[in-house]
Design a protein with these regions (language model features):
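Alpha-helical transmembrane-bundle signature of multi-pass membrane transport and export proteins
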Residues: 1-159
Length: 159
């Protein structure tokens, strides 16, 4: 019996989508934080807004997991990616050049809320996309993508 492949079409599509989504969010969130720092000159405001924007992900990820268990995960991920895109377009059109700190904070919190549901949906999808004997490797790939975006996203956002 031949060994199953880790990088099936569906797993590859999900992973590429995750890379694009997570890198985009990490770059954007860090760049917005730097924008706040440039506007205010205050490291305290910079850190406060960045910390506040992480709270929804920390608190609501378990609820995102429940939602991912009860709804079609692929649909959740697609809806959330389009929601992120819509939020970016609205923010850019209305507030990007205004220097409105409340709008920046709200936008960053919205991105964090989306992430609180998106990431559990990705993780819950893995067992349905790969064979059981490849599950550990597939989970490793997903976690590696998360780690790399967390590390490299801010670097790219600072450029």
């Amino acid at each position: 019996m031949p060994a199953s492949r880790l990088f099936t079409r569906d797993f590859t599509l999900m992973t590429v989508g995750q890379i694009i989504s997570l890198f985009g969010n990490a770059i954007l969130r860090f760049a917005l934080s730097l924008h706040v720092l440039a506007l205010t000159g205050s490291a305290a405001v910079f850190g406060g807004i960045l910390a506040l924007s992480m709270v929804p992900t920390a608190l609501l990820s378990p609820l995102g997991g429940i939602l991912a268990d009860r709804m079609p995960r692929a649909r959740i991920m697609v809806i959330l990616d389009f929601s992120t895109c819509a939020c970016i377009l609205v923010f850019d059109a209305l507030f990007a050049r205004s220097g409105n700190l409340a709008a920046v904070t709200l936008f960053m919190v919205l991105l964090s809320l989306i992430q609180a549901v998106y990431q559990p949906s990705v993780q819950a999808s893995v067992p349905t996309l790969v064979a059981e004997e490849r599950l550990t490797a597939a989970n490793g790939v997903v976690l590696q993508v998360q780690a790399l975006t967390g590390l490299l996203g801010p670097v790219l956002g600072g450029i």
